[in-house]
């Protein structure tokens, strides 16, 4: 049982036969899918049952899937990366491996209290900065605003008024100091949201995450959300209060066809978590009939954006936004709904209740899937804890592929912890990334070996008329290993898309291929079988999003032309041709100058270590000729940087060891200079004794007490050893002097 299965307490019936009104029922498929689950249907961890259940789409092979997208008020962090990479992997597997026809919907929450508050904060800070820059603005205009911001109070009306007064004073003094004098929260919040939405989508592109089939923005859905809420009111499951609208949980709960808290009933006790879902600018709880009622429409207060509605100007609550947008695309029956486990309550719980109230149905979503938490050193990411790692920051340390491997090595539904590696206050990496980097290197080296072996046979395409293809025992063993890997991968895919299990099976196949290549003479390799293994590994990695679906062997991600004409060919070949010409010119110049072998070898090393890596080529020197390997230039640069860092550390260690050895030698020589008769009268012995015999051996301690016989015997041994070292020193000094005299 995985960690994700253990973390769900069992709250309700697990199947349709366990209770008169089950919390979840297996989906009733349409005629196109009446035969039940496909033989190869995966079993998904369903948050309704907290168990793995067979996946059965409602409409044959078509899958309607909605996931909660970002609330765009800040930069995306590693927690977002894990969530969206995991859903990208699951989506790719469902589409490319299981061959479902997936309609994938993601929303963008661009109306939210956090965005509104951040927009006001940025405006206020910009005005204070402008006032400070131009100078001469009265303190009576800046001090109240600074005090309000410092207090942490969420009085946006006062904040807006104070900021506007300061803006007017700045404009009166310098009209050019402010570029947007007519700023209003109605437009300002959306400008902020658009900025972070664009950044988020670029982050997703950089991470190799496929775009959704439909993107729904809250700001484009306000009219439909109002209509959606009205239907819920008309059905008797919501009520208006002081211009806001609330969902009536007790009425919904008492209806025979409905159940509230299907996902996590225990979470109802967490009032703080429920209130957090209402937003930072929520109205007084006294407006609600019951404590568990939640807001569908918020009456806007001064300083807050607003849209028209039958209940007065306001804006949608967080939960209703997803219900309305998902329903608009997928309707009253959704195959899969998903998001991070932190959205389980109250967001997804309320989303279900609203939608089932709107359609007056028992079950709106058939499978709820949640990705596991990602923590930093066991703590939730927070700027106040200084453990907030953005996607952009992570991509400066690792490639997108390496980060994806990190997540693939952990089950998507399990919690995950990252341990930062720090130099001072700066995070330079994560301990868990070491396994991901090693995994990537394992696959890269595997593809290099396969393609190198095929090139060595003169049949890079896997076939040559001159190559023998008859199988021997080694080929039969490798064939069995390929079959075993296929079975292992398939079993892992069926088991809740168990990506660690998939990687494990692929690594076992790599081990079998490496064993085959080591056992068979290079000229006797059977290329078709070897190519089959390479293509299978490539295909599965493509399903996981770490390889390109080019039809070839390898991870891909190698730039170059598209083969579409002379221009693209020239553009692709230009860097390599430039390198060849430069190298030829350098070698010719060295030859004409009569350069020695070392200079020519340095030029060759420069091409290997600098020129070729910039083209994405790694050159391995070996007996019988060098072997070239194609790689991502950025990965080669990082590999070179790691090697340089390791070399520098090794050299620094050698330097320290050399200094330490020199220090010890100097100390030893200094001690050897001391005559044995003077040994116990100086240094560490200086204050230990008061009387000595004729040979300088101590006879009495510093208090005048005569030393014991055993103690004197021990000191005599020390003095004898010193005499040997001193005699060596004198002999060496005499020899050195004799050498100088001879010269």
Q: Which role does the model predict for each range below?
A:
Residues 2-73, 87-88, 195, 199-207, ...:
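Alpha-helical recognition segments enriched in aromatics with Gly/Pro capping
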Residues 3, 8, 49-54, 58-206, ...:
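N-terminal, positively charged nucleic-acid-binding surface of large information/translation enzymes
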Residues 2-30, 389-743:
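Structural preference for alpha-helix termini/caps and helix-kink/transition segments
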Residues 68, 176-183, 300-308, 486-489, ...:
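Short glycine/proline-rich turn/loop motifs
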Residues 214-215, 367-372, 621-626:
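Long, charged, glycine-rich C-terminal linkers/tails
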Residues 100-103, 235-242, 615-620:
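Short, well-structured beta-strand/strand-turn elements
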Residues 105-113, 133, 213-225, 243-252:
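Short, glycine/charge-rich beta-strand/loop segments that flank catalytic centers
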